[in-house]
Amino acid sequence: MKSVAVYGSDASNAHACKVGLASFDDQSNVISLCEFFETTNDRLPTLESILLQLQPSAIAVCCNSKLLLKRMTGIASTLCADVKVTDICSDAAEADMARLAIGGDLTRYTAILKEEHSVKAFSVLAYQFRLLADTSLYRGCDFQALPVDGVYMRLDRACFTALNILPPTPSESRKNTSLYGLLNKCRSPGGQKKLMVWLRQPLVTLSTISTRHDIVDCLLEGEAVRQKLQTEVLSKVVDLEKIKTKLRRAEAEKTTGGVQLEDLVGVYEAVVAAQTLIELLEKLQSSIHYTTIQEELVSPLRELVQSFEGFMRLIETCLDMKEASLGKYLISRSFDTQLAELAEKKEVIEAKMEKVRSSIAKKTGIDSVKIAEAQTPYMLAFRVVKRYQQDILSCTDKSIKQVQLNKAEYLFTTPELMDLVASLKSVEGAYNDASTAVIAKTVSVASTYHPIVSRLSDLLSTIDVLAAFALSASIWKLVRPIVSEDCMQMEGARHVLIEARQIETGYKQQFIPNDVCIDKESNLQIITGPNMGGKSTYIRTAALCALMNQIGSFVPCKTARLPVFSNIFCRVGACDEQLRGVSTFMQEMLEAACIVKTADTKSLVIIDELGRGTSTSEGFGLAWAIAKDLQQRIGCFTFFATHYLELSKIPGAVNRHATAFIKDEDITFLYEIKDGVAEKSYGTHVAKLAGYPLAVINAAEDRLSKRQKVIS
């Protein structure tokens, strides 16, 4: 879980502010710090993007401005706590950081200490989340700079919503209603978490993107290896991150830290899985990308397996691995003479219990008599199906005592069994007491391995996600994109989420793919055409493919050539935010203003309608000005879907339109995007589909005809 603190102050520029941010990850004990300027303090896009990447469980905000505090709180939503400036003591921040830093040494963090707002954000973090109250953190935290630009693609909340990147609820994490659900073919808990992180943090480094593509390509080609890897290996890997957190706590607190023997066996089995993965991945040597597999996966796995040799010997020596395979986690009797003696006593008692059971079965003629656990009260008893109750009572003496009578079973005991059960409990109690000390020593040694457990978890989850990408590519016919900085070309691009939904619902018509082509020389594309004609789907498809490429996935096209984008901006619809006193039109303008202030030449912008909430002439003027600014001053790739046909006259714009077929005043949407400008928007035809009264439609067409004559 991550906790985040934000400290903000107004800058000398009335429209800007300076922000410091501190994040604490309680699983890795890493405190990340950064500070940055927000050039537009009405939207705070950089802060919003970082919070979406981090996905914190709790946020604390401290500001010297009520207006800024209100805006920050709006971004942080319900997870936010307000910390007063007077509550924090930044003068003590350096001393507090030294108490938490590994070895108490701050010399490695001099650059961070010079960032005033970062340090103040740390003070807010330490105050709100009581970091210094947890002595297990002392001299055990690593400080690092949190990258603001140049490491991950920046995405805002509007983009996550417009592209359906994440599932709306955890219950939909496997459904194809979101990109996460579509790609989530992961087999391990760590893989599912890693996929969520990758979707929040798309890459912007070409070499890292290509590395992921190489591995996906290799696993797609080696289908048999991938299937074994997923079904026989990764599906058995437990949540190593949780176990690592327990082990780290155990080492820091010098206790068992909540570590169970089952956890240690889980790590043991994960190492065995890593050994199997090495063998499977080495079968891909014929692939042209095997060098990448070797460098990124096989060699690191082999190093980790070697690092675990001592751990594996510890577990094999201390634990009864035969019992562990049956789901019973016990200290091996051969490890301790006292445990061996108690185990022998236990076996003798169990043999006597079996002799009593066999005697009753022989006496009653009921072979199905079993020794079972009764729940009320909890104890061991004999069990038969209910129809044998009278047979038991008639064939045995009066010493039989009923323990439990259920709908389908009868549980009973005898004085002899009761004595044996009492003896068994006594021996088991002594066994547990003796094993507790051994368990504590075992955990103490095992806890020192938590750093490499973390590395193993990271590597196995990475393999899991890349294997899921390969499986998704096989299912949905995704192709590897060629990365090119100067153009975006896709042949037969499909919106894979809509396609998946059509297949699931039995929709008869196949998804209509479209070609996408845009480059630096013609970086503005105006898309016109009727509502429901496919304009929105077309521009979302372009953005979705760009995102999929930069997380390392293949894309839904026949062929694809894509650049690496620094960010994606989506302005695709708005609604009134009455609680904030913001109208639909104002919301549109705020979003558009944020885009033109923060977009750069490497941005991808998709706009689906703009300027509808004011007069037609004013809306058109604003749409024209914003489109021209994105085209000329910023120079980014822009897809602009609109009903303002006049925007097609922007010099240098490429015009495309959604096609429709009209026959006998009925409209049929073809969902094909072709070159040129739409003849009209077909609004009255769509109104007819919506069930408008014919008289209203006729009146609308008459008024439209008269207006067009006046304009002419």
Spans of features found by a protein language model:
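Amphipathic heptad-repeat alpha-helical coiled-coil/stalk segments that mediate oligomerization
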Residues: E94-A95, E269-V348, T376-T414, D464-I526, ...
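ATPase nucleotide-binding head domains, primarily ABC-like/P-loop NTPase cores
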Residues: E115, R387-L417, L466-S712
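Secondary-structure edge/capping motif, primarily at the C-terminal ends of alpha-helices
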Residues: L219-E223, K244-T255, I278-I288, I360-K363, ...
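C-terminal helical "lid" subdomain and adjoining coupling/linker elements of P-loop NTPases
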Residues: A250-E269, L694-S712
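Extended, charged coiled-coil "arm/hinge" scaffolds of SMC/Rad50-like chromosome-maintenance ATPases
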Residues: K401-S444, L460
